[in-house]
């Protein structure tokens, strides 16, 4: 365990960014927190979490794949992908850190997504423990401990001190470049963890029951009449999918500038009526079917195919951002009523 006075945090950021790009959660002009390239004077946000997740750094909303240049009858491939460079992602919360493991199951399984894999290989994740969990948080339901976040490096802030623990070879390599960190014990961290875990037990969503969902529940849940009632209030705006740290759906499009055809991918949403649109039509033409697909995927289909691992991390972003307050917790509770 290492430590650093919080007053020297900017010096730490400067040392890290001297060798590679550093992203930290910082407030923008509108007061919204997002992961931003650190520059001198940019301060770490005091908000619990960013509006959009840290997923953006590994799976960007828009990403170049390849280009084509046509000269007469000749077609040439042009490398247009953004080059992967080493970077450090500081201040990732435990929920977002778990989301990387979920995305890994999708993009790093064979055949590997080389674009995602390159970013994962070049990124060093520094997590930051939560001390003030909010009412929308329910990550413990999925076995996540926000007081002990996992990452290449885990950090805690307590008594105006940053505590720093390297967990992987990447973490050790970065730590070795930061001589301002001093050895210490973990007594202060252990005390903070105890306080945070006590707070978690008092949250409104503490003890959220997941017994009605999970692997093997397709037959029991697919034709439940509650889907109609739940889906009727949904606007189909897709906000939940764009703030979600685990959604991984995308579309592939092409843009012709006249000199170069650029093929790129961009996030898509299963809540949209033209999602996976094909010449024969869309596979889920109604709002009910699309709504059911979104939540069945996170709560049943993904666990079915991934050793029981849910496709949700309990970050609470969909609870905070849905304009009509329809969210995954309401779905879980509604489906669990008959089960209980």
Q: What spans do the regions from the language model cover?
A:
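General structural feature for long, well-ordered alpha-helical segments within catalytic domains
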Residues: 8-12, 240, 266, 327
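Active-site-flanking alpha-helical
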Residues: 100, 245-249, 323
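Iron-sulfur-associated redox domains of electron-transfer enzymes in respiratory
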Residues: 1-217
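Basic (Lys/Arg-enriched) interaction patch that binds polyanionic ligands
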Residues: 231-251
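Ferredoxin-type iron-sulfur electron-transfer modules in oxidoreductases and energy-metabolism complexes
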Residues: 210-232, 250-340
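Short alpha-helical basic/polar micro-motif
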Residues: 93, 238, 242, 320
């Amino acid at each position: 365990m290492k430590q650093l006075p919080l007053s020297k945090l900017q010096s730490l950021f400067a040392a890290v960014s001297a060798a590679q790009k550093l992203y930290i959660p910082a407030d923008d002009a509108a007061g919204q927190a997002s992961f931003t390239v650190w520059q001198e004077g940019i301060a770490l946000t005091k908000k619990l979490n960013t509006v959009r997740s840290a997923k953006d750094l590994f799976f960007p909303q828009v990403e170049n794949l390849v280009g084509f240049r046509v000269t007469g009858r000749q077609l040439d491939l042009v490398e247009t992908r953004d080059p992967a460079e080493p970077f450090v992602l500081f201040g990732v919360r435990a929920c977002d850190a778990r989301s990387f493991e979920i995305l890994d199951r999708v993009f790093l399984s064979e055949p590997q997504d080389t674009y995602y894999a390159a970013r994962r290989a070049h990124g060093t994740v520094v997590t930051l423990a939560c001390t003030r969990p909010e009412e929308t948080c329910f990550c413990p339901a999925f076995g996540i401990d926000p007081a002990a976040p996992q990452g290449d490096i885990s950090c805690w802030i307590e008594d105006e001190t940053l505590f720093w623990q390297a967990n992987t070879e990447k973490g050790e390599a970065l730590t070795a470049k930061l001589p301002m960190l001093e050895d210490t014990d973990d007594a202060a961290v252990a005390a903070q963890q105890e306080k945070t875990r006590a707070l978690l037990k008092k949250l409104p969503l503490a003890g959220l029951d997941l017994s009605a969902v999970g692997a093997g529940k397709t037959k029991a849940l697919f034709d439940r009449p509650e889907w109609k009632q739940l889906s009727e209030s949904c606007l189909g705006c897709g906000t939940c999918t764009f703030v979600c740290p685990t959604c991984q759906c995308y579309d592939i499009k092409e843009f012709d500038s006249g000199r170069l055809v650029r093929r790129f991918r961009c996030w898509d949403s299963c809540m949209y009526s033209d999602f996976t649109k094909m010449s024969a039509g869309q596979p889920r033409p109604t709002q009910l079917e699309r709504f059911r697909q979104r939540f069945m995927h996170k709560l049943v289909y993904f666990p079915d195919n991934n050793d029981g691992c849910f496709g949700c991390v309990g970050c609470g972003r969909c609870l905070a951002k849905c304009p009509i307050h329809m969210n995954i917790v309401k779905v879980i509770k509604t489906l669990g009523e008959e089960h209980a």
